[in-house]
């Protein structure tokens, strides 16, 4: 089932895509995680909505630093509501 995308989600995803296409290639591959932090942010915003998605992406960005081991770190699935 497809869910609707709010204007705020749409703008956030487009800004991240702009970063991926223009800025990221200039900086080179630096992310220690799979999926990359920018892809994680897009998936989190699409899956959880703008507020929780940005929160999850912010937490992920704080973990991505030179002392981090990195590795596979997917977006958590939403909890089911009964």
Swiss-Prot record:
Subcellular location: Cell inner membrane
Gene Ontology CC entries for this record: plasma membrane
Highest taxon above the source species: Bacteria
UniProt KW keywords: Cell inner membrane, Cell membrane, Membrane
Major localization class: membrane
Membrane topology: Peripheral membrane protein
UniProt family annotation: Belongs to the UPF0161 family.
PANTHER family: MEMBRANE PROTEIN INSERTION EFFICIENCY FACTOR-RELATED
NCBIfam families, A to Z: membrane protein insertion efficiency factor YidD
Protein's job: Could be involved in insertion of integral membrane proteins into the membrane.
Name of the protein: Putative membrane protein insertion efficiency factor
């Amino acid at each position: 089932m497809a869910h609707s995308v709010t204007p705020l989600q749409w703008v956030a995803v487009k800004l991240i895509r702009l970063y991926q296409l223009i800025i990221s290639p200039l900086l080179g591959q630096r992310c220690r995680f799979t999926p990359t932090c920018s892809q994680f942010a897009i998936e989190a915003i699409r899956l959880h909505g703008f507020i929780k998605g940005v929160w999850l992406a912010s937490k992920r960005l704080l973990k991505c630093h030179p002392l981090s081991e990195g590795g596979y770190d997917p977006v958590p699935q939403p909890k089911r509501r009964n």
